[in-house]
């Protein structure tokens, strides 16, 4: 990931909007499948089929060697969980599903955490707070503001609720390139970091943990889990900085 921040034109942002809307529609399509007894590979295969049927490409497949089309991160998995035929969803699980279709060369990147059956009280609170963190991070985006404003808004809310913010994985610039500048930490201090300018497009994707923020990478080289084995949740949108605020590009129709 380089340091050069590319400002997108209105036409390019429209392309990103089209990709983002398809990503949101894919999550809407997968949501009813998230039930006890289904495997993460079944979710992956349906996502791949649906993406192809809509004339798009699954960006994660083969990206730096990633073997599947989506990421499925269950319970203590923070991010980049690999779908597998033996990973069966159980009642009480939480699962983050992260999708990135490519439409006409542009990436639409978003994720949601779903409940599998009835969640525990702590899981329910964690997921609620994580979604609130995403909303607060987006609300902190203003032209002329700083990247640190985003992380500060997220971190203050998460920690006030007794949770922690993952440090090892951050949001990122995105367009025709999957991951590019700027990096968007989900922690930090308001007024710090690079200035937000109209035309910047990036993801905000807070990963919030029940316990410690520390992560451990598994031997597969992809799956990151919480160091203490406690729960982690995540929500993600791709956004554009506008002349007067912010636009979420990964909203459904």
Curated annotation (Swiss-Prot):
Q: Which GO terms describe its cellular component?
A: cytosol
Query: Which residues are listed for substrate binding in this entry?
Result: 80, 179
Q: Detail which positions bind a divalent metal cation 2.
A: 109, 172, 205, 236
| InterPro entries to which the protein is assigned, alphabetical | Creatinase/aminopeptidase-like, Pept_M24, Pept_M24_MAP, Pept_M24A_MAP1
Keyword match Protease? yes
Record-listed E.C. numbers? 3.4.11.18
- Which residues participate in a divalent metal cation 1 binding? 98, 109, 236
Any one Gene Ontology BP term: proteolysis
Keywords assigned by UniProt? Aminopeptidase, Hydrolase, Metal-binding, Protease
Q: Give the catalysed reaction(s), semicolon-separated.
A: Release of N-terminal amino acids, preferentially methionine, from peptides and arylamides
> The organism sits in which domain of life?
Bacteria
The free-text cofactor remark is: Binds 2 divalent metal cations per subunit. Has a high-affinity and a low affinity metal-binding site. The true nature of the physiological cofactor is under debate. The enzyme is active with cobalt, zinc, manganese or divalent iron ions. Most likely, methionine aminopeptidases function as mononuclear Fe(2+)-metalloproteases under physiological conditions, and the catalytically relevant metal-binding site has been assigned to the histidine-containing high-affinity site.
Any single GO molecular-function term of the entry would be: metal ion binding
Q: Which cofactor does it need?
A: Co(2+); Zn(2+); Mn(2+); Fe(2+)
Give one Pfam hit by family name: Peptidase_M24
Belongs to which family?
Belongs to the peptidase M24A family. Methionine aminopeptidase type 1 subfamily.
Describe the subunit structure: Monomer.
What is the recorded function of this protein according to its Swiss-Prot or TrEMBL entry? Removes the N-terminal methionine from nascent proteins. The N-terminal methionine is often cleaved when the second residue in the primary sequence is small and uncharged (Met-Ala-, Cys, Gly, Pro, Ser, Thr, or Val). Requires deformylation of the N(alpha)-formylated initiator methionine before it can be hydrolyzed.
Record's PANTHER family? METHIONINE AMINOPEPTIDASE
Please report the name of this protein according to its UniProt entry. Methionine aminopeptidase A
């Amino acid at each position: 990931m380089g340091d050069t921040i590319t400002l997108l034109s209105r036409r390019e942002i429209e392309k990103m909007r089209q990709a983002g809307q398809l990503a949101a529609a894919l999550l809407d399509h997968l949501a009813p499948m998230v039930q006890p007894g289904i495997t993460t590979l079944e979710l992956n295969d349906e996502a791949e089929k649906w993406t192809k049927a809509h004339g798009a490409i699954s960006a994660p497949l083969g990206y730096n060697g990633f073997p599947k089309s989506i990421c499925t991160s269950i319970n203590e998995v923070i991010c980049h969980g690999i779908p597998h035929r033996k990973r069966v969803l159980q009642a009480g699980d939480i699962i983050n599903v992260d999708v990135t279709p490519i439409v006409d060369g542009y990436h639409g990147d978003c994720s949601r955490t779903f409940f599998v059956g009835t969640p525990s009280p702590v899981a329910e609170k964690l997921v609620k707070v994580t979604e609130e963190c995403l909303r607060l991070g987006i609300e902190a985006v203003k032209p002329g503001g700083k990247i640190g404003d985003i992380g500060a808004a997220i971190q203050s809310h998460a920690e006030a609720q007794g949770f922690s913010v993952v440090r090892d994985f951050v949001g990122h610039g995105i367009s025709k390139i999957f991951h590019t500048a700027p990096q968007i930490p989900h922690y930090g201090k308001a007024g710090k970091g690079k200035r937000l300018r109209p035309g910047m497009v990036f993801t905000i994707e807070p990963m919030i943990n029940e316990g410690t923020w520390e992560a451990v990478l598994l031997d597969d080289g992809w799956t990151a889990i919480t160091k203490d084995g406690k729960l982690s949740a995540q929500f993600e949108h791709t956004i554009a900085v506008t002349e007067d605020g912010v636009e979420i590009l990964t909203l459904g129709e």
